[in-house]
């Protein structure tokens, strides 16, 4: 499976929602590295959505790392990326990746993480609706 091999090549952290202690440890480690300038990709849905170009609810807790690190949040809209993994084909597949306007700490510092999650979700959802050609 391609994604599994890609994840082996990069340092990635998987949250085990059933193990709170391990999750807190990962949050602390990633926050420390983010404060030091390392960039991370975080999937705030907590799991993969199998519906074409639709999103699940974002988990507010996934934004705790950015708030603790006072880091900018760059929403990214993935359109048709499911085709790469779900079509079981080696044919050329077109997908879209849209990097949206960063949300800086000063803009979200007084917001609750659930509100940040909704803001980011809504921005990505709007981009998908505007650009989804399917």
PLM regions with names:
Residues 24-134:
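Non-catalytic C-terminal accessory region of glycerolipid acyltransferases
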Residues 1-20:
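Catalytic core of membrane glycerolipid acyltransferases/transacylases, capturing the structured
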């Amino acid at each position: 499976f391609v994604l599994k091999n890609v994840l082996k090549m990069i340092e990635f952290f998987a949250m085990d929602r059933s193990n709170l202690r391990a999750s807190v440890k990962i949050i602390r480690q990633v926050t420390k590295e983010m404060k030091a300038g390392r960039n991370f990709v975080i999937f705030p849905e907590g799991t993969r959505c199998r519906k074409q170009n639709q999103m699940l609810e974002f988990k507010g807790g996934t934004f705790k790392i950015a708030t603790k690190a006072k880091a900018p949040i760059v929403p990214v809209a993935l359109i048709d990326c499911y085709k790469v993994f779900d079509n079981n084909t080696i044919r050329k597949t077109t997908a879209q990746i849209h990097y949206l306007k960063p949300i800086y700490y000063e803009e979200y510092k007084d917001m609750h993480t659930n509100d940040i999650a909704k803001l980011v979700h809504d921005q990505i959802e709007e981009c998908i609706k505007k650009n989804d050609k399917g």
